Amino acid sequence: MQISDAEWQVMKIIWMQGEQTSTDLIKVLEKRFNWSKSTIQTLLARLVEKECLTREKQGKSFIYSALLTQEDSKKLLVQDIKDKVCSRRIKQLLADLIEECDFTLADLEGLEEVISKKKASAVTEVRCNCM
Protein backbone atom coordinates (compact mmCIF):
# COMPACT_ATOMS: atom_id res chain seq x y z
CA MET A 1 0.00 0.00 0.00
CA GLN A 2 1.38 3.40 -0.98
CA ILE A 3 0.62 6.35 1.26
CA SER A 4 1.57 9.82 0.03
CA ASP A 5 3.42 12.34 2.19
CA ALA A 6 0.24 14.39 2.53
CA GLU A 7 -1.73 11.31 3.60
CA TRP A 8 0.95 10.58 6.24
CA GLN A 9 0.35 14.05 7.68
CA VAL A 10 -3.36 13.35 8.02
CA MET A 11 -2.68 9.99 9.66
CA LYS A 12 -0.23 11.54 12.14
CA ILE A 13 -2.89 13.97 13.35
CA ILE A 14 -5.46 11.22 13.83
CA TRP A 15 -2.94 8.98 15.62
CA MET A 16 -1.99 11.81 17.97
CA GLN A 17 -5.47 13.23 18.57
CA GLY A 18 -7.70 10.18 18.17
CA GLU A 19 -10.90 10.24 16.14
CA GLN A 20 -11.62 13.57 14.49
CA THR A 21 -14.51 15.24 12.73
CA SER A 22 -14.02 16.33 9.15
CA THR A 23 -14.54 19.92 10.30
CA ASP A 24 -11.75 19.69 12.89
CA LEU A 25 -9.38 18.03 10.43
CA ILE A 26 -10.07 20.66 7.79
CA LYS A 27 -9.38 23.48 10.28
CA VAL A 28 -6.08 21.96 11.42
CA LEU A 29 -4.82 20.98 7.97
CA GLU A 30 -5.85 24.27 6.32
CA LYS A 31 -3.96 26.19 8.99
CA ARG A 32 -0.89 23.95 9.16
CA PHE A 33 -0.36 23.20 5.46
CA ASN A 34 -2.48 25.83 3.70
CA TRP A 35 -4.41 23.07 1.91
CA SER A 36 -7.85 23.74 0.47
CA LYS A 37 -10.96 22.08 1.86
CA SER A 38 -11.36 20.02 -1.34
CA THR A 39 -7.74 18.79 -1.13
CA ILE A 40 -8.30 17.64 2.46
CA GLN A 41 -11.56 15.93 1.55
CA THR A 42 -9.77 14.13 -1.29
CA LEU A 43 -7.00 12.97 1.07
CA LEU A 44 -9.57 11.71 3.57
CA ALA A 45 -11.50 9.86 0.85
CA ARG A 46 -8.29 8.21 -0.39
CA LEU A 47 -7.36 7.10 3.13
CA VAL A 48 -10.83 5.60 3.60
CA GLU A 49 -10.53 3.85 0.22
CA LYS A 50 -7.10 2.47 1.22
CA GLU A 51 -8.66 1.26 4.47
CA CYS A 52 -6.36 3.42 6.58
CA LEU A 53 -9.32 5.34 8.04
CA THR A 54 -12.95 4.66 8.82
CA ARG A 55 -15.62 7.29 8.21
CA GLU A 56 -18.93 7.47 10.07
CA LYS A 57 -21.65 10.05 9.52
CA GLN A 58 -22.55 11.99 12.66
CA GLY A 59 -25.01 14.81 12.13
CA LYS A 60 -23.66 17.09 9.42
CA SER A 61 -20.08 15.88 9.84
CA PHE A 62 -18.11 12.72 9.36
CA ILE A 63 -16.02 11.18 12.13
CA TYR A 64 -12.69 9.72 11.01
CA SER A 65 -10.82 7.05 12.98
CA ALA A 66 -7.59 5.22 12.24
CA LEU A 67 -7.79 1.65 10.98
CA LEU A 68 -4.09 1.57 10.14
CA THR A 69 -2.13 1.44 13.39
CA GLN A 70 1.12 3.29 13.94
CA GLU A 71 2.83 -0.10 14.31
CA ASP A 72 1.53 -1.27 10.93
CA SER A 73 2.48 2.06 9.37
CA LYS A 74 6.02 1.62 10.68
CA LYS A 75 6.21 -1.75 8.92
CA LEU A 76 5.01 -0.14 5.68
CA LEU A 77 7.58 2.62 6.00
CA VAL A 78 10.42 0.17 6.68
CA GLN A 79 9.41 -1.90 3.65
CA ASP A 80 9.18 1.25 1.52
CA ILE A 81 12.71 2.27 2.53
CA LYS A 82 14.03 -1.22 1.83
CA ASP A 83 12.41 -1.07 -1.62
CA LYS A 84 13.79 2.40 -2.42
CA VAL A 85 17.29 2.34 -0.93
CA CYS A 86 20.11 0.08 -2.09
CA SER A 87 20.65 -2.53 0.62
CA ARG A 88 24.35 -1.59 0.63
CA ARG A 89 23.40 1.98 1.59
CA ILE A 90 21.08 1.16 4.51
CA LYS A 91 23.96 1.35 7.02
CA GLN A 92 24.73 4.91 5.96
CA LEU A 93 21.05 5.83 6.05
CA LEU A 94 20.82 4.55 9.63
CA ALA A 95 23.99 6.42 10.58
CA ASP A 96 22.60 9.62 9.05
CA LEU A 97 19.31 9.21 10.94
CA ILE A 98 21.18 8.70 14.21
CA GLU A 99 23.26 11.82 13.55
CA GLU A 100 20.30 13.98 12.52
CA CYS A 101 17.74 12.95 15.17
CA ASP A 102 17.55 13.61 18.89
CA PHE A 103 17.69 10.61 21.23
CA THR A 104 17.62 10.09 24.96
CA LEU A 105 20.33 8.02 26.58
CA ALA A 106 17.75 5.25 27.03
CA ASP A 107 16.94 5.41 23.30
CA LEU A 108 20.61 5.02 22.40
CA GLU A 109 21.03 2.15 24.84
CA GLY A 110 18.04 0.46 23.20
CA LEU A 111 19.66 0.90 19.78
CA GLU A 112 22.89 -0.60 21.11
CA GLU A 113 20.92 -3.60 22.34
CA VAL A 114 19.30 -4.09 18.92
CA ILE A 115 22.72 -3.91 17.24
CA SER A 116 24.20 -6.38 19.74
CA LYS A 117 21.45 -8.90 19.03
CA LYS A 118 21.77 -8.37 15.27
CA LYS A 119 25.50 -9.20 15.40
CA ALA A 120 24.60 -12.85 16.05
CA SER A 121 23.02 -13.11 12.59
CA ALA A 122 25.35 -10.75 10.70
CA VAL A 123 26.20 -11.72 7.12
CA THR A 124 29.69 -11.54 5.65
CA GLU A 125 28.52 -9.39 2.74
CA VAL A 126 25.36 -7.38 2.09
CA ARG A 127 23.96 -8.18 -1.32
CA CYS A 128 22.76 -5.36 -3.54
CA ASN A 129 18.99 -5.36 -4.08
CA CYS A 130 19.03 -2.91 -7.00
CA MET A 131 18.97 -5.45 -9.81
Predicted segments with their positions:
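Short, cationic-aromatic polyanion-contact patches
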Residues: 3-6, 58-77
